[in-house]
Amino acid sequence: MESGFTSKDTYLSHFNPRDYLEKYYKFGSRHSAESQILKHLLKNLFKIFCLDGVKGDLLIDIGSGPTIYQLLSACESFKEIVVTDYSDQNLQELEKWLKKEPEAFDWSPVVTYVCDLEGNRVKGPEKEEKLRQAVKQVLKCDVTQSQPLGAVPLPPADCVLSTLCLDAACPDLPTYCRALRNLGSLLKPGGFLVIMDALKSSYYMIGEQKFSSLPLGREAVEAAVKEAGYTIEWFEVISQSYSSTMANNEGLFSLVARKLSRPL
């Protein structure tokens, strides 16, 4: 299986951040499968970070890609956020938004949606500025390494977040389990692990470019998380899938887990 799995080098050479953003995060067609999934993710992130008490000083977002939607509610609950990705072009795309460069992707429809969820305490521009102020570092990461962020010195995090990343980064189940343990090395004991990802997806498309995904069901994910030294506090599955031209997933899952004080 691994021989046919999209390599890291392919992400560096063929992953186009702008195409990805245009395909999956344009809120223009609110009724598309992609928009429905994005709204679901935003609602769950709001629930986790604004209603359920997942908060603290430091949140590390693993595999941010070129996106910021996953941090719009988190910036209300964490003083500092570190964004990370494997591909340089995704980090560059994030920097464009952080620096308000004119060619940065327009997240304002998504930001407005989150502000509505949060009761319109602030307007979109203020929310964007709050997130920009919260993001303290933009770092390279590789979840398959025992030190996912290399030698960068960071205090143990209160929360590690990963959305739509691990399935694409791990070619097999043992690698997936190791990646979860590697993420645990970034967390303080009792710290939160928040993951959202597709279920049973073997690929996703960006235009004509196909990228591999590790097709895991709920039971495999739950077992891997527990084996990696966490206790699961919340696990939700929805049946909504991406458009058939975009991916072959069978729903998505969201989970909140906590790192055990003593490793298994």
Curated annotation (Swiss-Prot):
Nicotinamide binds at D197, S213. Changing R18K: Has no effect on N-methyltransferase activity. PROSITE patterns: NNMT_PNMT_TEMT, SAM_MT_NNMT_PNMT_TEMT. Keywords: Acetylation, Citrullination, Cytoplasm, Methyltransferase, S-adenosyl-L-methionine, Transferase. Changing R132K: Loss of N-methyltransferase activity like its citrullinated counterpart. One of its GO terms (cellular component) is cytosol. Predominantly expressed in the liver. A lower expression is seen in the kidney, lung, skeletal muscle, placenta and heart. Not detected in the brain or pancreas. It catalyses: nicotinamide + S-adenosyl-L-methionine = 1-methylnicotinamide + S-adenosyl-L-homocysteine. Pathway: Cofactor metabolism; Amino-acid degradation. The modification N6-acetyllysine is found at K39. GO terms for biological process: methylation; nicotinamide metabolic process; positive regulation of gluconeogenesis; positive regulation of protein deacetylation. It is found in: Cytoplasm. S-adenosyl-L-methionine binds at Y20, Y25, G63, Y69, D85, N90, D142, V143, T163. Monomer. Belongs to the class I-like SAM-binding methyltransferase superfamily. NNMT/PNMT/TEMT family. Prominently expressed in the stroma of high-grade serous carcinomas. In tumorigenesis, regulates the epigenetic reprograming of cancer cells associated with increased cell migration and metastasis. This is Nicotinamide N-methyltransferase. The gene is NNMT.
